[in-house]
Amino acid sequence: MQDGIHPNYQETSVTCGCGNTFTTRSTRPELKIDICSECHPFYTGKLKYVDTAGRIDKFQKKFAAGTYGSLQKKKAKKATK
């Protein structure tokens, strides 16, 4: 291998949004993640909504009426002369 062209491969501290911290190796000194194996529903067996930037709230607000009729487009007004 050539000297000086490869990135520095070092120990990295990974911090999850739930507070879990672990170390691994990477070219970055620190990583911040939203979800890890300690809080992911697949690994914990608990149902948990992972809401990124309020997407669930936005969806519920958009479809709050809940009826199909409210989702249809309104009729166009008659043209006047």
Curated annotation (Swiss-Prot):
It comes from the Bacteria. Binds 1 zinc ion per subunit. Zn(2+) binds at C16, C18, C36, C39. GO terms for cellular component: ribonucleoprotein complex; ribosome. PROSITE patterns: RIBOSOMAL_L31 (PS01143). Its cofactor is Zn(2+). InterPro entries: Ribosomal_bL28/bL31-like_sf (IPR034704), Ribosomal_bL31 (IPR002150), Ribosomal_bL31_A (IPR027491), Ribosomal_bL31_sf (IPR042105). One of its GO terms (molecular function) is structural constituent of ribosome. Keywords: Metal-binding, Ribonucleoprotein, Ribosomal protein, RNA-binding, rRNA-binding, Zinc. SUPFAM superfamilies: L28p-like (SSF143800). GO terms for biological process: translation. Part of the 50S ribosomal subunit. Binds the 23S rRNA. HAMAP family: Ribosomal_bL31_1. Belongs to the bacterial ribosomal protein bL31 family. Type A subfamily. This is Large ribosomal subunit protein bL31. It comes from Rhodopirellula baltica (strain DSM 10527 / NCIMB 13988 / SH1).
